[in-house]
Amino acid sequence: MKGKLLMAGGIAFVLVAGLVDAARWPRPYPVSLSTAKPASQTSDDGHVAARPETKNDILIDAQNARPAPAIASGEWINSEPVKLEALRGRVVLVDFWTFGCYNCRNTLPTLKRLDSAYRKRGLTIIGVHSPEFDREKRIENVRREVGSLGIDYAVVTDNDYETWRAYGVEAWPTVVILDKRGRVRFMHIGEGLYDEQESVIKQLLAE
């Protein structure tokens, strides 16, 4: 009987602890993801086939694409505050990350390469820094890490997770690519699919 009582008490403690922890996050609790299994379909010419469904890892058909939510106000690094409306005519890659995320760091070489290769051709990259821990909320820490990581594109803090929630993000890192009319055309969670992302950028720049 004593053993059963101890077990019941342990289960109750775990449940209460889980509820308390869940209350810390006003959204689905995020996780860091490693390389995800590719789900896109790439043709022989390197193009990602457009589909009407609004799923991850596919190029969403323009007629079915939803307008991208606004980027909430925050502290901007490497740029003055930017509104998506001002970027009409440009392809925009929004990268949800946090500097303490190992998987996010693994994506940075590709993001920096894409920025260098396509900025003058019409691509804008915005890093939305949605923190996991308190130390990642301090602007001085974010500025330091952005500098030390060699990030030249715009970064905006999202300490209250407003932009995170608006885009329905659930994990770090998540990449969202918008077309020239500000519509969500591609979304990928985790590392990987770098070639597919570049192909999507090329296709959207050509539209």
Regions found by a protein language model. Give the residues of each.
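N-proximal helix/coil linker or "cap" segments that precede and/or mark the start of modular domains
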Residues: 20-72, 88, 207
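Proline-centered helix-kink/hinge sites
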Residues: 69, 102-103, 109-113, 154, ...
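Hydrophobic membrane-insertion alpha-helices, especially the h-region
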Residues: 8-21
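A short beta-strand-turn-helix
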Residues: 70-92, 115-118
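Positively charged n-region of N-terminal signal peptides that target proteins for export
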Residues: 1-4
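Short active-site neighborhood of thiol/selenol oxidoreductases, capturing the structured segment around
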Residues: 82-105, 111, 125
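Thiol/disulfide oxidoreductase modules built on the thioredoxin-like
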Residues: 90, 145-153, 157-202
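Structural microenvironment flanking redox-active thiols in thiol-disulfide oxidoreductases
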Residues: 105-149, 159-165
